[in-house]
Amino acid sequence: MEHRSYMRGGPGPSIVPVALLLLLLSPHSLGAGTSQLAEERDVEILRKLPHNSSSFTQGLEVQGKSIFESSGLYGHSRLSEIDSQNGEIIRQVSIDDSYFGEGITVKDQSIIMLTWREGLALEFDISNFSIIGNFSFEGEGWGLCYNGEHMVTSNGTSELSFRDPNSFETDFTLLVTWDGNPVSNLNELECVDDRIYANVWMEDTILEISSNSGIVKSYASPISISSTQGKGPEEVLNGIAFDQDSGGFWITGKNWTEMYLVNFTISEVKLSPDESSVFPALVAASGVTIASAILLFRVILKKKEPETPNFKDSHR
């Protein structure tokens, strides 16, 4: 005997309209598929320090109460230690005129400094700034940070190289994308946990990048700061260092007169005039979609109900 459920022929509601309703109300149907888009961050200034305007800043790093800075240009490249309380230079050392200093990072008791086109990374003793070693690498050197496992370097392209900290050999590269598009001109870097913060050369932009996927998670545009600094075309925003004591970031630029301790805060939603006119239309369209789904749901349910006999045609 074939057993059939008596429920199959009953007038109960079908799962089809319910599924349809849920589909229409899902985030994807309402245009919420933008979760991969980078979020904007506001820049909150916490403190200011005077900055040596002769410094063509290439890298910043905070260690304790000191800020270490590398300055570039052939014949003018140097490494400096700055007091984070008053901005005074504690000490500095110039490097060979044939080297163009670039990004720096701290590893144990050493400071590593990239050079631009010389294919060398110089290792300094952090206690006395003497050069105690170097590493060779191919291509240009721009930004550098250390995440505890890899030395991460940029070369002005959209790729970051993750290097063995002992040999400086490249273990792998990571393509950086912003809303699905590669980001070129990646410059100064700062590693913080599983994130990499990057300046973009010639732009007033700081990116927060996932070191796992290369996707830009958020961005900040400190235009209110950079608009008061740097009058020449080369005097751009560059230099970012995480300050563990305050939880903020020190930022500055090439030949700027000040350094700024900032926080990146969640940005308030600001709609442009065009977006303001589109948003109500999207809401209205969503309302129509929901209303249509409910109406369809009711129609299907009604068709499932037993029909009342047409007594005009009934034999009873």
Regions inferred by a protein language model and the residue ranges of each:
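Secretory targeting signatures
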Residues: 1-36, 189, 269-316
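A short helix->beta-strand "capping" segment at the edge of beta-propeller domains
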Residues: 35-54, 86-88
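Beta-strand-rich domains and repeat architectures in extracellular enzymes and scaffolds
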Residues: 46-78, 93-105, 253-255
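Surface-exposed loop and turn segments in beta-propeller and other repeat-based domains
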Residues: 47-50, 90, 94-97, 173-182, ...
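Beta-rich, blade/repeat-based domains predominating
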Residues: 53-64, 97-108, 137-148, 154, ...
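Conserved beta-strand positions in repeat-built beta-propeller and related beta-rich domains
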Residues: 68-74, 106, 111-118, 153-157, ...
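Short loop/turn segments that connect beta-strands within beta-propeller blades
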Residues: 82-87, 125-129, 165-168, 210-214, ...
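Blade-level signature of beta-propeller repeat domains, shared across WD40, Kelch, NHL, RCC1
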Residues: 239-273
